[in-house]
Amino acid sequence: MTSFSHLSRLRMSAFLPHVCLQCRLKTVSSLPAQSSASSLLQAVRHASSARPRRRTPSRMTLSPNVAQSTVKYGEKRKSVRHQNGPFGGMNQRRANLRDRQRPRSQAELKRTSFKKDKDGSEKKQPELFKALKMQTALSSVSYGRRTSIKSKISNITSFDQFDLLPSVRQSVYDSALPGLEYVTPTPIQRLAIPAILRQGSATPKPEEGQEDMPRFDQYLLAAETGSGKTLAYLLPVVDAIKRTEAKDKEEEERMAKEELEKEQEQAKEKNQNLFELESPGEEEEPINAPKSVVKPKAIILVPTSELVEQIGRIVKQLAHTVKYRSALLASNYTPRKIRKTLFNPNGLDILVTTPYLVASIAEANPYIFSRVTHLVVDEADSLFDKSFSPKTNTIIDRTAPTLKQLILCSATIPRSLDNRLRERFPQIRRLVTPNLHAIPRRVQLGVVDIDKEPYRGRRHLACADAIWSIGRSGNPYDADVGYQVTGQKEPKSIIVFVNERETAAEVAEFLVTKGINAVSLTRDTSEKRQAQILAEFTTEKNPPQPEDYKMLKGNRSDDDSVPFVNVRPGNERSNRLSNTKVLVVTDLGSRGIDTVAVKTVILYDVPHSTIDFIHRLGRLGRMGRRGRGIVLVGKKDRKDVVREVREAMYRGQALI
């Protein structure tokens, strides 16, 4: 009998393959020891009805959160958003509180970052700026720090808020930025000018074992291109020179007064002792003695002679209002002009030059660094690379005994420069703007695929077609008011950047054959020719005034005729682009040149790094102006890098 019951239990478990294990065990254990076949079948029929006990409905359970209010006192409760359907919102197990967001776990966030492909498989979303991160060369700045800097400088809206001398402050309006109705400092000027004016606050006192550390203040000015970095360091330097000059003048007056009193006392003693011999006085300097070299108080170092001319122009402009002596030294100057500058009997306050030239002068005249109190290293990323760093470091070491402030300035901070500054100047104060390593959003970037029709890989033809399209196009509403009134064509200046020096001459020659006024600028170009070419792209011509329109109207033969504005010419089509000038250049023209007259830049070759992207496109959007960039891409170019640069520009993010 026992064996029969055991056998029946085994058969019963075989009949329940689709019933859960718990129900199966309950059914089998509830069977009697002696069972017939009919009772077994009846048990199988009702086995699926065996379920665990249902939980108590919510309407029969007291809420433990009665005292917990989800609405503040005095506020109205938000209306509940009903679900679609006749029974929507019924029997919900979770409260749908839309006023607060449910915290999500890391696993859930990771799952939501995946998206499904067409075949239903999960596909990982590509990492943002992956191509730029793979070839990153710039030192990043956290966005939290960028936000804090924005809030810090938001209260400064005028140059009058800076503790500058009245003459220095007035020179901004009269000399540096004349003719502007509203003059406000840029972000780097709001950061740098107050910091540099507080002398002695940037370098703490050396601790034990750090007596060999530099005693002068150290600053790093890092800001985007075209943001006014030159005025940011030049105004505090000029202010310090004028304050020191005033103190020296007071000291000279005091010394002269003491000397006069001393002479009067000696005269009284001489009258009392008439028979004593006079002591030999100091020997006078012979007339034919060699002249001493000038001893500037501030030196501004730049990498190229073009930058010497540009920054020297600003230094000379400020000197019209603030009286000081300045000079420029570059390799394209004649030996006679250099000698005249070095041995000027009137002295010198500010010297703008290149590291190699001033270092070679110091070998023969070491006293040129004896009075330097301010040293500015502009374009620091270039002056601290392998080619310039030995001379730059030598100049810093030789000026260190009398130096008060060292100012480094750059638009890009590579990781190599960042590491070198942390080793050499660990106490340097970093003044970084929120938009560092970012191209302004007012600059638009277009991409031309040269592999498509009608170019078929001919990069020269794509460049010429883009220039012709820009030269012939133009909305009169985008032009200056003077050109709208007189109907004249607005002159256009375009810069074409190439990677190789040989390519520049080839591209310029091809563009000339297509009726485009194009010239090339490389190291092979003579210094005089370089100055003439850059003058056309760095100086902006004033637009025609309404008086010119009146003069044109008065010269008409028919006084009753109606003047038409921007009348299109006939069907005659010229083979030359008369109102457009093109400059084909290498990276020689991408560093610091203030190309205010340029509104379009064409990247003939894709730049090698994001640093070149920033400097080349940085020729646009200067001082709040708009600009347009065009990059030509082919089969062998990194299209993913160009795409991410364009996306970063649209987002206003830094090119990491």
From Swiss-Prot:
Residues 210-431 form the Helicase ATP-binding domain. InterPro entries: DEAD/DEAH_box_helicase_dom (IPR011545), Helicase_ATP-bd (IPR014001), Helicase_C-like (IPR001650), P-loop_NTPase (IPR027417), RNA_helicase_DEAD_Q_motif (IPR014014). Keywords: ATP-binding, Helicase, Hydrolase, Mitochondrion, Nucleotide-binding, RNA-binding, Transit peptide. This is ATP-dependent RNA helicase MRH4, mitochondrial. Its EC number is 3.6.4.13. Residues 96-125 have a biased composition (Basic and acidic residues). A motif (Q motif) lies at residues 157-190. Residues 42-125, 246-270 are annotated as: Disordered. Residues 1-46 form a transit peptide. Its main location: mitochondrion.
